[in-house]
Amino acid sequence: MSAPAPVVVTGLGIVAPNGTGTEEYWAATLAGKSGIDVIQRFDPHGYPVRVGGEVLAFDAAAHLPGRLLPQTDRMTQHALVAAEWALADAGLEPEKQDEYGLGVLTAAGAGGFEFGQREMQKLWGTGPERVSAYQSFAWFYAVNTGQISIRHGMRGHSSVFVTEQAGGLDAAAHAARLLRKGTLNTALTGGCEASLCPWGLVAQIPSGFLSEATDPHDAYLPFDARAAGYVPGEGGAMLVAERADSARERDAATVYGRIAGHASTFDARPGTGRPTGPARAIRLALEEARVAPEDVDVVYADAAGVPALDRAEAEALAEVFGPGAVPVTAPKTMTGRLYAGGAALDVATALLSIRDCVVPPTVGTGAPAPGLGIDLVLHQPRELRVDTALVVARGMGGFNSALVVRRHG
């Protein structure tokens, strides 16, 4: 069987707690600069979780038309700006393309929590006549896909994936499939989240997975014996994907890499005795990419920061690759877990690793907990030629996804 038409990534747009814009984020990440701190956009002291990864340097009014500001939640503002930056990076002008060949495929784990909280407070505080008409869509988990497609006149196949942290991988993979089939010529794909408001935080706390540490430096320690949960964050990334022949024909300035393989699985119900965790998704993604385990240069881990989940992920990696056989990193220790935005940001970061032949560090974690058997890139970047990177993401409730990106050409 012939190999499928390669799909490449030609544009990146990043909005993250430790940097807005691709190069600012990448420089901060390589320097080990964290965007995790005590939450500042509201007073968190009445809550058990007080630390988060906020995008404090982001000013939506500096990037978006004034008419969009009152109708969009913060997560949508992040997504709109990241999409615009990705298109500019790719050198693509949507208005000059076939509008039905342009699609938007995003991931979402929640919706417009901050916008929704504000309007609910109006409803119960001053009456329904004060509630914004924009509430009808600003809260909706699919709104980022809609707003991006409207803003850029992208009328082709569009969708949204709601698989929590795994969603960014699932959206990118589906975009690649549509491009290979010829359903789309160009796709904007990725995810952005922004649920760091009182209502959003309270909705997350019952999971029991959030860190209650008050020191930002010790709050998120995946694979460490001291791990006690993850730090919630906001932001994400958008990517421009297209077929390699299309990128070549238009003489794209940059090809970051290609989307080579993907798989998703779902954990069995507890008590069935069937295996859980991401090992099967990893194997299937490698199979689709036609990559042997020994050819993977780095793994971008899900890194839940929850001891049982960390151990399950480490065991899955050891099962597929062998103990300590492949470098593993978790730069999300500098941003917090961004839910649907997190996996998209990991894909962008993996592509930057391929471009610059360097693996960013995991910060905070002192050393892997005894018995995990992983080669964790700690404290400093590791110079390494990266031709193949694997990104792993797990969503709450049993979602497992894995995506392989490779150097192109």
Curated annotation (Swiss-Prot):
Q: Which GO terms describe its molecular function?
A: 3-oxoacyl-[acyl-carrier-protein] synthase activity
**Keyword match Transferase:** yes
Q: Which PROSITE patterns match?
A: KS3_2
> Sorted alphabetically, which InterPro entries does this protein's record hold?
Beta-ketoacyl_synthase (IPR000794), Ketoacyl_synth_C (IPR014031), Ketoacyl_synth_N (IPR014030), PKS_Beta-ketoAc_synthase_dom (IPR020841), Thiolase-like (IPR016039)
Reactions that this protein is recorded to catalyse: 10 malonyl-CoA + 8 H(+) = tetracenomycin F2 + 10 CO2 + 10 CoA + 2 H2O
Q: Which residues form the Ketosynthase family 3 (KS3) domain?
A: 4-407
Specify the pathway. Answer: Antibiotic biosynthesis; tetracenomycin C biosynthesis
Which region is the signal sequence?
none
Which Pfam families does UniProt cross-reference here?
A: ketoacyl-synt (PF00109), Ketoacyl-synt_C (PF02801)
Q: How would you classify this enzyme at the top EC level?
A: transferase
- What SUPFAM superfamilies does the record tag this protein with? Thiolase-like (SSF53901)
User: Biological process (GO) annotations?
Assistant: antibiotic biosynthetic process; fatty acid biosynthetic process
Q: What are the entry keywords?
A: Acyltransferase, Antibiotic biosynthesis, Transferase
What EC number(s) are associated with this protein in UniProt? 2.3.1.235
Report the CDD domains cross-referenced here: CLF
Anything else known: This putative ketoacyl synthase lacks the active site cysteine.
Tell me, what does this protein do in biology?
Involved in the biosynthesis of tetracenomycin C (TCM C). Part of a type II polyketide synthase (PKS) that catalyzes the synthesis of tetracenomycin F2 (TCM F2), a precursor of TCM C, from malonyl-CoA. TcmK and TcmL form a heterodimeric alpha-beta complex that catalyzes the condensation reactions between the growing acyl-enzyme chain and the malonyl-CoA extender units.
**Record's subunit section:** The tetracenomycin polyketide synthase (TCM PKS) is composed of a ketosynthase complex (TcmKL), an acyl carrier protein (TcmM), a cyclase (TcmN) and a probable second cyclase (TcmJ). TcmK and TcmL form a heterodimeric complex.
The family this protein is said to belong to: Belongs to the thiolase-like superfamily. Beta-ketoacyl-ACP synthases family.
State the name under which the record lists this protein.
Answer: Tetracenomycin polyketide synthase ketoacyl synthase beta subunit
Say which species the protein is native to. Streptomyces glaucescens
